[in-house]
Amino acid sequence: MKSNLENFNFQTSIREQVVPSRKKVILPAWLEVAKPRLIPLLLATTLGGMALTEEWPLSSPKLICTLGGGALAAAAAGALNCLWEMDLDKRMKRTSNRALPSGKLSFNTVFLGAVSCTFAAAMLLISGVNYLAAGLTLLGLCSYVILYTIILKPRTTQNIVFGGVAGAIPPLVGASAATGHVGLSGWWLFGLVMLWTPAHFWALAILLKDDYASVGIPMLPSVKGSAFTVKAISRYGWATVFMSILGVFALPEGGLLYVIMLLPFNGRLLQLINRLKSSPDDLEKAKGLFRWSILYMFGICLLLLISRTQLSVDFEQQSMQIFLSLKAYFNI
């Protein structure tokens, strides 16, 4: 009995540390419903989509309008998600103190705010960017609220696999903002985010599987268990690594430096996945993988931006010159 109690306390403490800022930083109620912690990564992948185009860097006004519109749309999506799941949040201890279930904000107030943010995002993107970027942004919003939150999340363990399309749309927005269309490079980053999402989210779901099970949400770890989930994480992790390497062909230039700098990111991701495979119920290892997966995607986007600098281009040219010199020297 004592060991079970100690194990419960350990798991509870780990769950409370997954996103420690929820404990340490009290957000204003109106900001909390916008889920601001999710927005920076969405904007990072938007920048990544831009960096894959020949038109990078964009003019400052277009860049600001794209990122501003994306942030407003993401805030609207977060608020609408909170509205739909308000009753669900009331039943979960972890979420019962959120702004809506606790009564800090009313349904009408949040709904009005979400509609206002959606309208502002559309106007900003239409006037400052183009119709395609605006349409894709609204498609991402609807995908998150309707496809994932309403349709898939309460019905299938594969909810995040197909619902992950919402989080993968920002690279398409970035590419379309830069060029007016979505090329193959933009679709590459879309695919990378789609493959990365299950491994990223299921690591978090392992930590919260009891919470999801208590309210009947069929997250994969809650239904199939941690061991089964970690095997799925491993498959998606390897697919993510393979897809990330293909980025060398997606970049207009600077791909050599990208693929070299990519190695430690992929190595660390696979290392953490293998550690979790050895102990699927180890919440510390699940937490470590979840946190690194966030840094991983930020890192990928940063590498894409670095690869478009003159330094990266010069490195690639000098490397090619060295290769050709060695080839001539050895008569290859």
UniProtKB/Swiss-Prot annotation:
Family: Belongs to the UbiA prenyltransferase family. Protoheme IX farnesyltransferase subfamily.
Role this protein plays: Converts heme B (protoheme IX) to heme O by substitution of the vinyl group on carbon 2 of heme B porphyrin ring with a hydroxyethyl farnesyl side group.
NCBIfam families reported for this sequence: cyoE_ctaB, PRK04375.1-2
EC number(s) given by UniProt: 2.5.1.141
Pfam families tied to this protein: UbiA
UniProt GO BP: heme O biosynthetic process
Subcellular location, record wording: Cell inner membrane
Membrane-crossing residue ranges in chain numbering: 63-83, 109-129, 132-152, 160-180, 188-208, 245-265, 286-306
Catalytic activity: heme b + (2E,6E)-farnesyl diphosphate + H2O = Fe(II)-heme o + diphosphate
GO cellular component: plasma membrane
The name this protein goes by in its record: Protoheme IX farnesyltransferase
Keyword Transmembrane helix found: yes
Taxonomic lineage: Bacteria, Bacillati, Cyanobacteriota, Cyanophyceae, Synechococcales
Organism: Prochlorococcus marinus (strain MIT 9515)
Membrane topology reported for the UniProt record: Multi-pass membrane protein
